[in-house]
Each structure stands twice: as structure tokens, then as C-alpha cells.
């Protein structure tokens, strides 16, 4: 019946590698192969001083696997400097990188939150759209009012749609007037009117049947 | 671990239990004890918060997938002679790793041709200690056919059954914290990891860290099975989705 015919100690391959020091981390981030860069990115989370090197590495990294570890290291360091290092990647032409950057910000929401209102006013509509997603996923007492303010002034219907989607998730009764004003403003944009109608129904049903 | 407002009662009840267990007369007194880790209180506190509700042959479809597809896929890329390594994490009180062992013995025709190492790990050291003992009540055995209970257990008394020694020695148990990389790395690389119903308790950052640790613990091409309500795609892009007839699992890419 035994499943092992030789002692487990002989059978178990070991993966424990010596811990990297800060210098070795920087060296491997800059010049290592895929496995070495992955290991260095993971180890870098223990070295807040590595933030600029992580940013440089992200700018050139081609491997999605290593990139994930680089974003995670910045999220684990979780300083305003690491948030600032991630923000430019919200402007990437690659949607995957934009999502990875957004996920990394969500993983350090307390540190990232102060940057979100600024992102909602960014000149780039796609950054404002990403910011609406962050607002949706970072619960905050001012999240609803931020979305409502945006709905009153935002010229781009796609950004408004992202804010409407956020309000459909987090909205409360106070959001209804802003949603209705936005529907009025975009009467000529049927998809947005439709989204707003759904969001209003959802907010109303949440007001009537609040979740536990 | 993350507990929302809805779990306040759950948290309070366990904190009160630990205060009683340590004869602390106020929360301040207990909190001081916890922070100083007096007599390993941090471990006791963590143990109090873990959920150890499970049973044999839970999510059997994944066990079917293991013997129908996953092991065959691993054998096509593994060097001959290397052991097959399977990790059950978290393993709670051992029902899952012992289920894997019984399932393999009953359902995998090649079971005698390979060394198969099954490791069960959990952060709850009390649960790990119980897993090593391997004594179970009726509820844990409810899904196991009576024939298998007779074959792999001996009746302790009318209400509990003990895993046979041979089978007990086929599973190695360890304590592990999934978000502690140094800790997970010590366990080596596995062909298949069962990691069910734990990532849902983590916050975003802990989930990312755990996913990356599990990625490192998988051999290239190795598989990870999550609970049926969980999706690795929502946690991490590191893994590929692998769809089989009996289960959807996740796979570390070969490269």
C-alpha cells in the first residue's frame, strides 16, 4: 500500500535558494535571464530602495510573468514612490499592462487612494476611465461623490460609462440625481442612457434591499 | 486574511475565546500578550481563526481529473524515475491528502509504478497535529463508500475511525504560511497542487503573493486545483486555464 518506495527526503527536490542581497537584486533585475529576473523581482519587495530599479525594469520587461512579479514587488513595498512608479503604466498602449498596473494599485489601496482623485482629472480619457475602475474597487466614504462630480462635468461618454458602472456597484440614493443629470446630458448617446437606466434600477434596488 | 464588518461576530467570538484561554481579564491585557507572542500566542490566535470543516472525497470531480488527465500530462514531461509530488494546501485535519492517497490507490492503474509523495500542509498547527493522528468521525467519512472505510480505516470506537498506519505514513504533514515565500519554498516543487477555498480569505496583496508562491512551488507544466467557486484568472495572470472533461484547473506554463 505505501505510495513511497524510498525516503521522502531523497525524493523531494529542493528549491530553496540563497537569499539575494540588494546588490544582487539590482544586478539580476538589469541583466538576469527570465528566471533570475523573476527571482530578483520577488526578492526586491524586501528592499524599498529598489523602487527606481523596479520602475526601470518594468519599462523594458517583455516577459508577462516577470512583469507580474515586478508589479507585485512595488505593491508590497507600498510607498507613495511605488505608486508614482506604477502610474505611468496606466497610460500604456498595451491593455494588459494597463490592467496589471491597475491591479497593482488595488493591491496597495490605502497608499494608492490619495492619487485617485488626481487621476480622475487626468487629461487622458483612458486614464480617467481606469480611475473610475479604481474608485469602484477601492471602497471609500467619498467614492460616490467623486463619481457624481465626474458625471456632472465629464465630456467623454466612455469615461461617464465607467463612472456609471462604478455607481451601479457602489452607488447609494445620493447618486441618483447625478445619474439622471448625466442621462439628460447624453440623450444622444443611447448606450450611455441605457447604462444609466440599469445603474439607477440597481441603486434603487440596493437602497430598498441593502446587502448585509 | 481579511474579515469584513459582516464577520465582526466571528472575530469577536474567537478573540473572546483566546482571552478566556489565556485568562486575560481585559482586551488590553490580551492584546499585549498577543503582540509579545507570549507562549506562542500568535500561533494560537491564527489557529482560532482557521476553518477546518471538510470531509473525505470532497470535490471528487477533481480527483477524477487527477487520474484521468493531470497525472498522464505530467508523465509526458517528467524525467523517468522522478517522484510524482502532490501538495494539499491547506490540508486542514488531513481529509484531503488522505483522500488523494486513497483515490490513487483505488483508481490509478500506475500507482505501483511510481513513487508518489503526498504532502499536506496548513497554517493551523493544531489541525496539522490532528491530521498526523488521522482519526475521523462519521461526518468526515460521509462521502466515502463503506467498502473504502473498511479497507483503509480501523474502527477506534463506535464513533471514530483511524487511518491505517501504512496509509498514514504515505502522507507527510507540515505547517506552512502560504504568503511566506521562504516558508513555501522549503516545500519544493510539485506536479499537482490542491489549494482549495483559501485564497478567498486573503486580501488582494496576500492573494497575489500566495499565487506567486504557488507558481514557484509548481514544476513547469504543473497543475493547481482551486475550490469550485474560485478563479485563478481573477487573482493572477501567471497561470493558464486548463480545461479537462471533469474539471477546470490552472497550469503553470512550460516556459
Feature map (PLM): residue ranges:
Chain B
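Conserved AdoMet
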Residues: 1-87, 225
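Residue-level signal for inorganic ion chemistry
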Residues: 66, 193, 218
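A structural alpha-helix within SAM-dependent methyltransferase catalytic domains
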Residues: 67, 101-105, 215
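Extended basic-aromatic, gly/pro-enriched interface segments that bind polyanionic ligands
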Residues: 89, 109-194, 198-209, 232-233
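Conserved SAM-binding loop of SAM-dependent methyltransferases across substrates and taxa
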Residues: 93-111
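Core SAM-dependent methyltransferase catalytic element
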Residues: 192, 233-255
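A short glycine-rich, Lys/Arg-flanked "PGG" loop and its adjoining helix->strand segment in the class I
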Residues: 208-220
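Conserved beta-strand signature within the Rossmann-like core of class I S-adenosyl-L-methionine
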Residues: 220-228
Amino acid at each position: 500500500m505505501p505510495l513511497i518506495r524510498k525516503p521522502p527526503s531523497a525524493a523531494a527536490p529542493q528549491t530553496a535558494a540563497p537569499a539575494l542581497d540588494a546588490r544582487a537584486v539590482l544586478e539580476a533585475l538589469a541583466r538576469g535571464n527570465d528566471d533570475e529576473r523573476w527571482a530578483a523581482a520577488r526578492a526586491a519587495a524586501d528592499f524599498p530602495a529598489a523602487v527606481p530599479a523596479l520602475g526601470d525594469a518594468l519599462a523594458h520587461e517583455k516577459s508577462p510573468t516577470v512583469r507580474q512579479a515586478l508589479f507585485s514587488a512595488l505593491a508590497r513595498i507600498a510607498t507613495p514612490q511605488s505608486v508614482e512608479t506604477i502610474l505611468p503604466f496606466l497610460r500604456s498602449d498595451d491593455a494588459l499592462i494597463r490592467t496589471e498596473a491597475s491591479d497593482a494599485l488595488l493591491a496597495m489601496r490605502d497608499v494608492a487612494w490619495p492619487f485617485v482623485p488626481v487621476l480622475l482629472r487626468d487629461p487622458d480619457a483612458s486614464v480617467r476611465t481606469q480611475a473610475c475602475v479604481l474608485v469602484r474597487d477601492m471602497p471609500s466614504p467619498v467614492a460616490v461623490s467623486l463619481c457624481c462630480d465626474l458625471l456632472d462635468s465629464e465630456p467623454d461618454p466612455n469615461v461617464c460609462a465607467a463612472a456609471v458602472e462604478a455607481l451601479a456597484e457602489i452607488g447609494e440614493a445620493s447618486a441618483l440625481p447625478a445619474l439622471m443629470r448625466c442621462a439628460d446630458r447624453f440623450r444622444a448617446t443611447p448606450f450611455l442612457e441605457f447604462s444609466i437606466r440599469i445603474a439607477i434600477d440597481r441603486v434603487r434596488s440596493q437602497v430598498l434591499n441593502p446587502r448585509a | 486574511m481579511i474579515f469584513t464588518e459582516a464577520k465582526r461576530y466571528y472575530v469577536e467570538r474567537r478573540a473572546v475565546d483566546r482571552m478566556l484561554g489565556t485568562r486575560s481579564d481585559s482586551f488590553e491585557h490580551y492584546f499585549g500578550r498577543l503582540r509579545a507572542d507570549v507562549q506562542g500566542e500568535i500561533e494560537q490566535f491564527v489557529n482560532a481563526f482557521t476553518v477546518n470543516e471538510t470531509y473525505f472525497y470532497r470535490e471528487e470531480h477533481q480527483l477524477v481529473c487527477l487520474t484521468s488527465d493531470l497525472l498522464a500530462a505530467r508523465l509526458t514531461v517528467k524525467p523517468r524515475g522522478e517522484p510524482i509530488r502532490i501538495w494539499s494546501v491547506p490540508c486542514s485535519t488531513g481529509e484531503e491528502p488522505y483522500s488523494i492517497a486513497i483515490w490513487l490507490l483505488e483508481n490509478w492503474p500506475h500507482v505501483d509504478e511510481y513513487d508518489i509523495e503526498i504532502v499536506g500542509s496548513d497554517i493551523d498547527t493544531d489541525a496539522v497535529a490532528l491530521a498526523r493522528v488521522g482519526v475521523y468521525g462519521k461526518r468526515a467519512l460521509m462521502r466515502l463508500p463503506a467498502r473504502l472505510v473498511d479497507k483503509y480505516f480501523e474502527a477506534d470506537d463506535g464513533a471514530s475511525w483511524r487511518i491505517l498506519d501504512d496509509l498514514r505514513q504515505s502522507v507527510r504533514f507540515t505547517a506552512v504560511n502560504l504568503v511566506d515565500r521562504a516558508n513555501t519554498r522549503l516545500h519544493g516543487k510539485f506536479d499537482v497542487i490542491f489549494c482549495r477555498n483559501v485564497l478567498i480569505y486573503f486580501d488582494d496583496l496576500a492573494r497575489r503573493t500566495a499565487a506567486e508562491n504557488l507558481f514557484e512551488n509548481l514544476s513547469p507544466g504543473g497543475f493547481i486545483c482551486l475550490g469550485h467557486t474560485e478563479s485563478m484568472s481573477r487573482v493572477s495572470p501567471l497561470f493558464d486555464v486548463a480545461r479537462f472533461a471533469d474539471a477546470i484547473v490552472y497550469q503553470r506554463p512550460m516556459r
